[in-house]
């Protein structure tokens, strides 16, 4: 057969200009694919047969190679299959699943349902039909329930479907109390179990459930799993167990008796427990850190912008209960919880101007005390806990020698408080001084969103602090310049909401602190400037704020799984929240 090659010649009009026309048939690729599919069904020009079970599927190796890196490598790397005209998957693939994948290769269409989604995910991953695998993942994400979330966690881990794994993990964290006795729970890998029990987001109010779940999992395959026990035990919040249970476990539980590392972990928990109950100094051990579901929510507020009282919020019973009076009423302070203690830093009082004072409220013993004062008097600042230390960031201070006292420009200074020596230390300054910014910690780093600049403008930067390097850097840009916003953290996701403009006041965003990517989420139910937010039990709660002359009177809750906001309860109109913190609910004796 001869093949002629035609040279493309350029034609010119009488005026000498070029005359070129491009013809593009949009449906050409679809027509070719349809005709290839017809030839496959008629077994025309097929040069490869795939077998699954006892069924054969004639096809074209060029089509397979074009759709799948798996087949491309098989046919081009000198493997036996590149010479043979048969590939037999035996029983590793169900014939109907292979048929669906081939139909997709020749038509770009596939029907996914509850019966085949898991099989398509597995086969798509195995044969590197990545589009099919991703489509099956997306289908399973939309059909995730408490009854299947453990199985989906195992499946997504095996096939590296990161988003499905994260969604499954989140649902497992929310339903741990009903899942830990199931067959799927016993099938978890050690790393998956660690992902669950190490998370602050684990929704469990009785830590004994976690302790028993770990014992049960290890004993399901004792010979293979007993070496994992100390690592797992260290991630149980043992100091939150009743004292009698701790003592009994030390002398009666064979897994603990037989392992010196486990004995040391239990001894540490017993000492931490004793220290907490006796109010004997600061406890920073992981074994004494409560999970967020074991926290209670506290609103600090007053009948004016001058805060004078702490209120306990029971969002399940929908009650707001007065708890304690502040020793020194103040406004524009910041509050942050470390363990069972709430630290109230700085602010402005009614008489003594800008304050360096730090008041500490012990929620277990319901007592107030004073810690060492800050190095700089400040207000309009932010604070966050990081590695059991307290950081205060930015704000204003009073201008020296000016009467009446007027605020300084926004501060760059950052201070760190270590409760153990009761000492403040000046740390690396912010890249840009800010006040009225949202300050949170996530993944052992500090994040500062927006704020008011030294020039009194809104700031659009995300400032990021690495404590190991003691250095600030610019992490990302905010979707828009922000100040008077609120922030809350769920894992690696930081939720930002509110602001002081018409466009930002009701808006809410999610920032992934690992990828630095922003996602717009559902708007709040009301516009809020100077609101306050925190995360508890895999949900985000927002309280307070105002816009114009309208004061917000509801406690609202955001559910990330449904991307929806709901009002939980009303806040008394006479209560103006100044801060919102989450701390220990109770400690069993």
Curated annotation (Swiss-Prot):
Descriptive protein name: Kelch-like protein 25
MF term (GO), any: ubiquitin-like ligase-substrate adaptor activity
Pathway: Protein modification; protein ubiquitination
Domain BACK per the UniProt entry, residue ranges: 149-250
Subunit comment: Component of the BCR(KLHL25) E3 ubiquitin ligase complex, at least composed of cul3, klhl25 and rbx1.
A GO CC term assigned to this protein in UniProt: Cul3-RING ubiquitin ligase complex
InterPro entries, alphabetized: BACK, BTB-kelch_protein, BTB/POZ_dom, Kelch-typ_b-propeller, Kelch_1, KLHL25_BTB_POZ_dom, SKP1/BTB/POZ_sf
Gene Ontology BP annotations: positive regulation of CD4-positive, CD25-positive, alpha-beta regulatory T cell differentiation; positive regulation of fatty acid oxidation; proteasome-mediated ubiquitin-dependent protein catabolic process; protein ubiquitination; regulation of translational initiation; ubiquitin-dependent protein catabolic process
